[in-house]
Amino acid sequence: MNAIISPDYYYVLTVAGQSNAMAYGEGLPLPDREDAPHPRIKQLARFAHTHPGGPPCHFNDIIPLTHCPHDVQDMQGYHHPLATNHQTQYGTVGQALHIARKLLPFIPDNAGILIVPCCRGGSAFTAGSEGTYSERHGASHDACRWGTDTPLYQDLVSRTRAALAKNPQNKFLGACWMQGEFDLMTSDYASHPQHFNHMVEAFRRDLKQYHSQLNNITDAPWFCGDTTWYWKENFPHSYEAIYGNYQNNVLANIIFVDFQQQGERGLTNAPDEDPDDLSTGYYGSAYRSPENWTTALRSSHFSTAARRGIISDRFVEAILQFWRER
């Protein structure tokens, strides 16, 4: 492990969207193995403590990134039934840490990765409560509406700005976005592309003052991840409208990130798709019950193994390809 504890500057990556963008992997966290923190990987704080039982922190402090980031929705209490230490194996598992770990070999040794977590499970453009926003705490826990002036949007912009303002040397890599599932189910799904495009345009305008920290490109990249097979099979028309917009967007630098071939299954929290791996001490989602699972619809979310593997792999490939071409 690299001995540097405090990087001189950070590559900033904002992670936003709904549940599949965040820690909804239901398998057992392995904080001493696959999910180990790294001294050069940090996040912007949101909660009162860095982790359950950990030291206190304040909103937008730079703190270590773990497997369960400080998103708008707090997943730190959704413990796996076989977790033996709720101060280390707490909550659920996301992909942000694994994206950051896989980016480290491609950045200078004196730099780090700073993740800006801004996700909310169940959030949408066409449904959901707006919640509230405050400069001291960001978006409220019940904020579930995306747009150009909603609390979730204010949270997204203000925290990204805060990360860049920490150090003028910090560089913005872009936004990793996974969202659309909740809108798939609404009657207004066809308006999602317009709402999303307007939000991206607003975000880019609101980051103009940090132009030099975006390598002087005008349009900050958005890396838009795909969803699970469940949504594709059950909502094919609305899927084509929403995710088709990610794939063929009229705006510049909207990059679609896919994880599976058409018609392929697997990669979800469904117990038969998330097996144990006793060689690593990993126990999958089958042990969870209504008291501690994220939802009864298990195939609606990507698994812990998928987040550690193909999801973070594909995001990193897309990020590296984008910036190499510049």
Curated annotation (Swiss-Prot):
Alphabetical GO biological process terms: carboxylic acid metabolic process; N-acetylneuraminate metabolic process
Q: Which domain of life is it from?
A: Bacteria
Kindly list any coiled-coil regions of this protein.
Answer: none
**Localisation per UniProt entry:** Periplasm
CC per GO annotation = periplasmic space
The record's keywords, sorted A to Z, are:
Carbohydrate metabolism, Hydrolase, Periplasm, Signal
Effects seen without this gene: Cells lacking this gene cannot grow on Neu5,9Ac2 as the sole carbon source, in contrast to wild-type, but grow as well as wild-type on glycerol or on N-acetylneuraminate (Neu5Ac).
Leader sequence range is 1-21
Keyword Zinc-finger present in the record's keywords: the answer is no
EC number(s) of the enzyme?
3.1.1.-
Which Pfam families does this one have?
SASA (PF03629)
Enzyme class label: hydrolase
> What molecular function terms (GO) are annotated for this protein?
sialate O-acetylesterase activity
Inducers of expression: Induced by N-acetylneuraminate and modulated by N-acetylglucosamine, via the NanR and NagC regulators.
Q: PANTHER family this protein is in?
A: 9-O-ACETYL-N-ACETYLNEURAMINIC ACID DEACETYLASE-RELATED, ESTERASE, PUTATIVE (DUF303)-RELATED
Role, per record: Probably catalyzes the hydrolysis of the 9-O-acetyl group of 9-O-acetyl-N-acetylneuraminate (Neu5,9Ac2). Is required for growth of E.coli on Neu5,9Ac2, an alternative sialic acid commonly found in mammalian host mucosal sites, in particular in the human intestine.
Protein name (Swiss-Prot/TrEMBL): Probable 9-O-acetyl-N-acetylneuraminic acid deacetylase
